[in-house]
């Protein structure tokens, strides 16, 4: 839908109707402070809230990283989505009539919006159907399973809207398509039915299964998890990916857990649906689960938004598979873990039990579980404990293996204080109770860390571009354009410098962006732009006209690094200009050198001397500009 041309009246109505506090509040825990609202910034990692939302201005700003803008900017940056996608979602949310500039596109837009709304409706009706069927005679086996095997109360069954999918091949199909008259294509897109491979017709995706609705963070049903009640494989089966459901971005139970996570300032991540349900029933409601896939960074960051301390506790099974799952989860979010951006703890329950088994095995286990949560070791301590399992440090091979594992953990710790603490701890462990050996073991580990930190011949620099000059120029132009887009107060300075120095952008996609900026400023008379509408209007210009937006899309998004560049714009502008000025001088120097090679200094002495002087002048300018650039090198 990115090529849809939205009518300016539609965009203006959306801007007038939206409530930025309500929108951002879906993703960030906000607390009222005076006239504004404060929370943890979702665009960079912080422990103290510096993210401010102003309902009066309908703007947000982070004093930590400099991210700021309106509701459009927030949703575009957070979800890495296009302006059109965000505008359409907001229009749907606030029930705003969409106007486009082409009737055919308007029809396609209405079809897309109608389909999404229809999918939500179909999923809600299906959830109600499964839940109702659970209490019918055909659902008795499933209800008995929940009562006797899972020990769940009627209130919990109602709260999670658990249900039963009948054993028939076309039961849900007939209900949704033939009785409720939903289009068969929409029901198929919802992941509830499948087309038969041979012949015609459809059959139900879920049959003779216990059904568990999966909801988004707003509480809308977007998919189903299921457990077989017979011998069918697989034992657990989820909905396929659909327009509503993306497994790697969804956490089961987050809609019901988010308030508790905010209240107790921690989140517990378990393996299965019934672990979540059992813990919620026991009053431990800050619990969610991944959906049978490797944990993703997106899932962890969605949890972090609801906890100011960013404390997450992994409670996977304590068997070998669970230990491996914990290790994989740590690896998946390694940048967050090793840098300390998430306070991760690991809880393994006694006797290898999962949370559901543990809670239901004894009446006292609810209190015991809560105690174990408080005592759960930090992930580093847990990793060290895993290294020591079934190892005899008096055995040279075991000792060497443990020491290597410790070095591997320590070298990834970016916080020097944390590294020093665990370096001492590991030294004490390896000394095996002999205090005289502690300093020796610490020094030994430290020397390996120092050696390991040295870059090799093909070390961390292998990623650098093959053409550093071209790469540097592109970065400089991109930085200047980003400052121009996001810093209205710097635009007169940049305009003046570019005009006085007769500078042009060298890359085609940058020239096109500059052309669109110029057109938008002239059309909308943006000589003064206190609300910084330029980025939004330029993106709209790309959507309404031809142009490769992908090549410049990153310039409209603010990261922690780029926010720092904008904060230091007065230093970054001269640096970028210096690089851009170098290019024509380098070109002129090459021109002079070519002329010198063609001239005979004996017969063409005057011309030879002229180009020799010009070459030297260009060389001096290049040296001056390079020195100016190196004072504030581009990252």
Swiss-Prot record:
Domain Toprim positions: 265-348
Listed cofactors: Zn(2+); Mg(2+)
Domain notes: Contains an N-terminal zinc-binding domain, a central core domain that contains the primase activity, and a C-terminal DnaB-binding domain.
Keywords: DNA replication, DNA-binding, DNA-directed RNA polymerase, Magnesium, Metal-binding, Nucleotidyltransferase, Primosome, Transcription, Transferase, Zinc, Zinc-finger
Source species: Synechocystis sp. (strain ATCC 27184 / PCC 6803 / Kazusa)
Residues engaged in binding Mg(2+) 1: 271, 317
Gene Ontology biological-process entries: DNA replication, synthesis of primer
Enzyme Commission no: 2.7.7.101
Single GO term (MF): DNA binding
Binding partners and assembly: Monomer. Interacts with DnaB.
Broad class of enzyme this protein falls into: transferase
Zn finger residue spans: CHC2-type: 41-65
Presence of keyword Methyltransferase: no
Family to which this protein belongs: Belongs to the DnaG primase family.
A GO cellular-component term linked to this record: primosome complex
NCBIfam families: dnaG
Job description of the protein: RNA polymerase that catalyzes the synthesis of short RNA molecules used as primers for DNA polymerase during DNA replication.
Entries under Pfam families matching the protein: DnaB_bind, DNAG_N, Toprim_2, Zn_ribbon_DnaG
Protein's UniProt name: DNA primase
Reaction equations catalysed: ssDNA + n NTP = ssDNA/pppN(pN)n-1 hybrid + (n-1) diphosphate
Domain of life: Bacteria
Binding note for cofactor: Binds 1 zinc ion per monomer. Binds two Mg(2+) per subunit.
Protein's gene: dnaG
Residues binding Mg(2+) 2: 317, 319
PROSITE patterns named in the record: TOPRIM (PS50880)
């Amino acid at each position: 839908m990115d090529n849809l041309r939205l009518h300016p009246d539609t965009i203006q109505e959306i801007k007038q109707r939206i409530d930025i506090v309500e929108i951002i509040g879906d993703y960030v825990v906000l607390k009222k402070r005076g006239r504004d609202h404060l929370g943890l910034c979702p665009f960079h990692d912080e422990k103290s809230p510096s993210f401010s939302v102003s309902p009066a201005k309908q703007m947000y700003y982070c004093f930590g990283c400099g991210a700021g803008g309106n509701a459009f900017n927030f949703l575009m940056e957070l979800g890495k989505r296009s302006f059109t996608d965000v505008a359409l979602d907001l229009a749907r949310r606030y029930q705003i009539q969409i106007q486009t500039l082409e009737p055919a596109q308007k029809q396609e837009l209405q079809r897309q919006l109608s389909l999404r709304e229809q999918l939500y409706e179909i999923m809600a009706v299906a959830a109600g159907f499964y839940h109702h069927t659970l209490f019918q005679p055909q659902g008795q086996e499933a209800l008995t399973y929940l009562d006797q095997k899972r020990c769940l109360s009627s209130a919990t069954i109602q709260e999670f809207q658990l249900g039963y999918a009948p054993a028939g091949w076309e039961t849900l199909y007939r209900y949704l398509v033939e009785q409720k008259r939903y289009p068969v294509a929409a029901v198929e897109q919802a992941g509830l039915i499948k087309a038969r491979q041979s012949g015609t017709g459809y059959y139900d995706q879920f049959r003779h299964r216990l059904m568990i609705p999966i909801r988004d963070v707003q509480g809308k049903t977007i998919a189903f998890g299921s457990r077989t009640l017979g011998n069918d494989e697989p034992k657990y089966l989820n909905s396929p990916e659909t327009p509503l459901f993306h497994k790697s971005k969804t956490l089961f139970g987050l809609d019901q857990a988010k308030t508790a996570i905010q209240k107790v300032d921690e989140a517990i991540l378990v393996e299965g649906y019934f672990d979540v349900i059992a813990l919620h029933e026991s009053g431990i409601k800050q619990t969610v689960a991944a959906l049978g896939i490797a944990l993703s960074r997106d899932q962890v960051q969605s949890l972090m938004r609801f906890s100011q301390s960013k404390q997450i506790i992994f409670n996977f099974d304590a068997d070998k598979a669970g230990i491996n799952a914990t290790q994989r989860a740590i690896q998946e979010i390694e940048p967050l873990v090793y840098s300390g951006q998430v306070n991760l703890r690991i809880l393994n329950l006694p006797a290898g039990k999962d949370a559901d088994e543990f809670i239901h095995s004894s009446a006292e286990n609810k209190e015991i579980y809560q105690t174990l949560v408080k005592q759960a070791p930090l992930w580093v301590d847990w990793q060290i404990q895993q290294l020591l399992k079934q190892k005899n440090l008096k055995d040279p091979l075991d000792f060497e293996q443990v020491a290597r594992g410790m070095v591997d953990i320590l070298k990834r710790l970016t916080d020097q204080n944390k590294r020093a603490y665990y370096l001492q701890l590991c030294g004490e462990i390896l000394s095996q109770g002999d205090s005289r050996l502690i300093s020796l073991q610490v020094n030994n580990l430290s020397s390996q860390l120092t050696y390991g930190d040295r870059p090799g011949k093909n070390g961390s620099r292998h990623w650098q571009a093959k053409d550093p000059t071209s790469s540097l120029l592109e970065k400089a132009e991109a930085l200047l354009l980003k400052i121009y887009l996001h810093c209205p107060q710097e635009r007169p300075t940049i305009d003046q410098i570019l005009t006085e120095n007769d500078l042009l952008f060298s890359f085609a996609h940058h020239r096109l962006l500059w052309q669109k900026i110029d057109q938008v400023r002239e059309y909308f008379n943006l000589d003064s732009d206190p609300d910084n509408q330029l980025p939004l209007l330029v993106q709209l210009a790309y959507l309404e006209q031809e142009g490769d937006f992908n090549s410049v899309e990153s310039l409209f998004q603010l990261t922690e690094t780029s926010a720092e560049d904008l904060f230091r714009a007065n230093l970054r502008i001269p640096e970028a200009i210096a690089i851009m000025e170098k290019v024509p001088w380098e070109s002129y120097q090459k021109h002079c050198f070519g002329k010198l090679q063609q001239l005979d200094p004996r017969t063409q002495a005057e011309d030879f001397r002229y180009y020799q002087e010009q070459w030297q002048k260009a060389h001096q300018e290049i040296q001056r500009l390079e020195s100016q650039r190196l004072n504030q090198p581009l990252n």
